[in-house]
Amino acid sequence: MCPHIGIELKIYYEAYGCTLSKAESGLYVNRMLADGSSIVKTPDEADISIINTCVVIKPTEDRMIQRISELSHSSKVKVMGCLSTVNGGSLADENIEVLTPKEFRSFYSGQLDDVEIREPSIMEGIPINQGCTGSCNFCISRVARGKLISRPVQKITGQVRMQLARGMKEVRITSLDTAAYGRDIDIRLPDLVRSITSLEEDFKLRIGMMEPRNTSEILSDLLDSISSNKVFKFLHIPVQSGDQRILDAMNREYSVQDFMNIVSEFRRRYPDSVLSTDFITGYHGEDQESFENSMKLLDRTKPEICNITRYSQRPFTPDYDRNPPPSNAVKKWTKEMSDFHRAIIKEKLESQTNSVKSLLITEKGKNETWVGRDDAYRPVVVPGQLHLFDRISCEIVGNGPTYLIGKLI
């Protein structure tokens, strides 16, 4: 049993990092709530502060360490997430407790499966598997999380039911690579999707990030499984580079053409859909030619969402000692790619003007507005007297930098 489980405490909670990591710590906190603990608004009120951490790049890791130090002045601190697994030893302090990899894996494989969801608002998603099947040379996440461990379908659908019983209407399933789900237990992601969408309740399902290599193996069945009206037509598939030489150096285990085939088939089946991808700029060996190949891929695929990250050398990875390109070149490439994608998204959003959308209201916005999601998971800001999880129709009358603006009809 993890420390603090079974004890009634006042909890202050902060979560950083990927959806998977937040989902896991959300389950942990819900486990404590089920034992009688409660959430407070400030660390000064808390018996313990729980912080979920991220170390994907060095600046983020530094911010995590600083924040942990700040929290430790107010209460005891429980550190979760990837920092605890890759650099937990740097946090030695009588007021700081680290959830070790062994401890969390034991908790994950047992006690998390039957957690009652007391507070759905802190749940970023439902984790479906730990670890991954990849061996990317730059990735510290696989170092932190280890080999693939998939959760049984019935445990996942059980937690979906709990969220729905608490009034949630948007369900997210998440992992480092959702397309890897079930490879270790003789089942695959499309089977899980069908099990979830077969539930009778009214909800929408968003499937989290999936890697190209595993997606290619299940593509046809996956696209069949998401045909349900309960599934957002949304695909997050990180490509990282549009240059084959760089992909090979990264040990990504797929080709540029593999990625393009996935995108092409997804959009053929679901023309009104949203594609999200990731690019890394400044990976070791990248030059102007390889960067231009990435720009060409960005132009050809025109993703609605594009996360662009400057390469950061991370300890315990094969590429830690390999030098990246000059920082001035990387800065230039990052800005050029970001500017180009802003033009893409501007055109994409403007093309939606005058269209009519059915929305699920998923969050409160600013200045008397609400934010809803259309069937492709586009965010739409709508003014009006609405409520969380209302279903509405609206006309698109404009857009902001990354969202649409709707008018109730």
Stretches found by the model and what they are:
Residues 2, 98-126:
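N-terminal [4Fe-4S]-dependent radical SAM core
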Residues 2-106:
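Cofactor-cradling patches in redox/metallo enzymes
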Residues 68, 72, 160, 190-194, ...:
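Generic structural signal for well-ordered alpha-helices
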Residues 78-81, 86, 165-287:
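Conserved SAM/AdoMet-binding glycine-rich loop
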Residues 121-154:
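Canonical Radical SAM [4Fe-4S] cluster-binding loop centered on the CxxxCxxC motif
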Residues 156, 173, 207, 237, ...:
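Conserved, mostly hydrophobic/aromatic
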Residues 233, 245-361:
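A structural motif corresponding to the C-terminal lobe/cap of the Radical SAM core domain
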Residues 321-409:
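Terminal RNA-binding accessory module
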